[in-house]
């Protein structure tokens, strides 16, 4: 017994010495940075429970349940500044909405920041190594594989996109009944995402489709929520989720679907099969299919599954969320819907080409404004891969550089910077598309409006999202002259962890144009 206590005492002593050494080393590096670069400490959120910050975590959790989590977080920035430190069931983290710091993280010191220490092991059971979870060579190779998917030819393939849009329009009631468009939009972009990734659509918009889209989307959403919760839990993940089997059940269902697609892609195809895979038109040009491209790099089914899921994860959600939020706002702002109607009527039956879509000023301002107040990914997290410096945020005036030790997690709060009254004026939180057409806007200075983030890790599908969402918006305005809100709750209640959508969907009634 005495020997056991001695061993425990020695181990405990070594742990304390190691911890003390790490703390002293961090303070030493911070002191040197302060002397060399003029770094000063940031303001801190005054946690009442200072060890883990459970008090702030509890507050944010309650606000998220109410659908007010984004606003609560933005209020922290209004109170404690554009860059501050906090604990929320975590070691000390940073949060910033300062444009200079965002630029530094996204581009200037891009290689100082990453995601792998934070996401790699945590997300491995579902996503595995890929563009969302890793840094370095794994990220570079994955990024190079998906880049051809989003070249102009693929982005501008609106003729094929129209096939899916027509199916969606045919499912919208034309008798004034209330309809929640959000689930239909999710089905639409599930179909388009599966086609450009796998070469074949699951056909969720097709009546009596054998594919159970609702069950699959439910499993995928549960998998995504599980990811976000585990990232948020950080070091407490093993304790909080050790007995949770529901996440595994959900992502296994998603894995089974993707594994089936991978098996098909690895099978040799005849020329006839390749033609059928492209669609009914035998003269249709050969398309870039992401999974086929990946099979040229590797034949490992597990690697292919991981790479596909890292693309499928954002591809299926961002566009559906964006168009749902647009309809949410237009149903509450009839003047903006009427302006869109006038612009659409001026098209006079011209084909909706890529160039025409880009020229529609009213539609563009509506899309931009919605992405400003409802960014699909309102918070971007990064971890310092080395000791580094942020250019601003330190000291009482928050204008001095800030020393950031290796391993520190920072939240880039896109929602806060895109609704900051200092940048956008007192009406920053109002839906006001006309602000984009009024003179030379302040936000032409970059880093104040980044709904898809920026730099090497910006969303590679940005142009595709903007093109398809604008096209769908125009087609809805062509097909329906009346848009009426049917949601009993008028305010926007946010739901979600990785991407944020309206808690109540997009409940409207539509009146046909003819």
Swiss-Prot record:
So where does this one cross the membrane?
1-21
Matching entries from Gene3D superfamilies are given as:
Cytochrome P450
EC code: 1.-.-.-
Residues the record lists as binding heme: 459
Ordered alphabetically, the record's keywords are: Heme, Iron, Membrane, Metal-binding, Monooxygenase, Oxidoreductase, Transmembrane, Transmembrane helix
Chief location of this protein within or outside the cell: membrane
Answer yes or no on keyword Transmembrane helix.
yes
- Enumerate the subcellular locations listed in this protein's record, separating them with semicolons: Membrane
Q: Which domain of life is it from?
A: Eukaryota
**What functional role does this protein have?**
Cytochrome P450 monooxygenase; part of the gene cluster that mediates the biosynthesis of the dimeric xanthones cryptosporioptides. The pathway begins with the synthesis of atrochrysone thioester by the polyketide synthase dmx-nrPKS. The atrochrysone carboxyl ACP thioesterase dmxR1 then breaks the thioester bond and releases the atrochrysone carboxylic acid from dmx-nrPKS. Atrochrysone carboxylic acid is decarboxylated by the decarboxylase dmxR15, and oxidized by the anthrone oxygenase dmxR16 to yield emodin. Emodin is then reduced to emodin hydroquinone by the oxidoreductase dmxR7.
Member of which family?
A: Belongs to the cytochrome P450 family.
> What is the official name of this protein in its record?
Cytochrome P450 monooxygenase dmxL3
């Amino acid at each position: 017994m005495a020997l056991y206590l001695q061993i425990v005492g020695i181990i405990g002593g070594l742990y304390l010495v190691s911890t003390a050494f790490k703390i002293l080393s961090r303070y030493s590096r911070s002191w040197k940075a302060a002397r060399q670069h003029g770094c000063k400490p940031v303001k801190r959120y005054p946690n009442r429970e200072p060890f883990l910050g459970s008090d702030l975590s509890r507050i944010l959790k309650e606000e998220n349940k109410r659908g007010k989590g984004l606003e609560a977080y933005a209020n922290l920035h209004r109170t404690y500044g554009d860059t501050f430190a906090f604990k929320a069931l975590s070691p000390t983290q940073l949060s910033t909405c300062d444009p200079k710091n965002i630029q530094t993280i996204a581009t200037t010191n891009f290689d100082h920041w990453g995601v792998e220490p934070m996401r790699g092991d945590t997300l491995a059971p579902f996503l595995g190594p890929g563009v969302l979870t890793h840094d370095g060579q794994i990220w570079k190779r994955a990024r190079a594989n998906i880049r051809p998917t989003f070249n102009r030819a693929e982005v501008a393939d609106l003729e094929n996109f129209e096939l899916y849009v027509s199916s969606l329009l045919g499912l919208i009631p034309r008798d004034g009944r209330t309809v929640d468009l959000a689930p239909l939009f999710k089905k639409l972009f599930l179909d388009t995402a599966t086609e450009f990734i796998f070469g074949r659509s699951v056909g969720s918009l097709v009546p009596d489709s054998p594919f159970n889209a609702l069950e699959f989307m439910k499993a995928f959403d549960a998998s995504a929520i599980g990811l976000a919760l585990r990232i948020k839990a950080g070091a407490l993940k093993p304790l909080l989720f050790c007995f949770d089997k529901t996440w595994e059940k959900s992502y296994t269902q998603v894995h089974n679907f993707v594994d089936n697609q991978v098996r098909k892609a690895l099978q040799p195809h005849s020329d006839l099969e390749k033609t059928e895979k492209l669609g009914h038109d035998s003269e249709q040009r050969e398309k870039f299919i992401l999974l086929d491209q990946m099979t040229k790099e590797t034949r490992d089914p597990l690697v292919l599954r991981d790479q596909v899921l890292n693309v499928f994860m954002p591809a299926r959600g961002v566009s559906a969320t964006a168009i749902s939020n647009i309809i949410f706002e237009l149903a509450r702002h009839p003047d903006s819907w009427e302006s869109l109607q006038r612009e659409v009527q001026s098209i006079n039956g011209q084909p909706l080409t890529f160039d025409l879509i880009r020229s529609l000023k009213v539609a563009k301002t509506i899309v931009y404004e919605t992405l400003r107040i409802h960014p699909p990914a309102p918070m971007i997290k990064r971890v310092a891969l080395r000791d580094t410096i942020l250019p601003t945020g330190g000291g009482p005036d928050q204008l001095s550089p800030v020393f950031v030790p290796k391993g520190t997690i920072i939240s880039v709060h896109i929602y806060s910077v895109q609704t900051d009254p200092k940048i956008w004026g007192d009406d920053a939180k109002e839906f006001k598309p006309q602000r984009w057409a009024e003179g030379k806007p302040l936000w032409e200075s970059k880093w104040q409006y980044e709904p898809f983030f920026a730099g090497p890790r910006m969303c590679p599908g940005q142009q595709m999202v903007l093109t398809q969402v604008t096209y769908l918006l125009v087609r809805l305005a062509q097909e329906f002259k009346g848009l009426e809100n049917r949601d009993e709750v008028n305010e926007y209640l946010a739901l979600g962890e990785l991407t944020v959508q309206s808690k109540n969907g997009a409940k409207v009634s539509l009146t046909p144009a003819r």
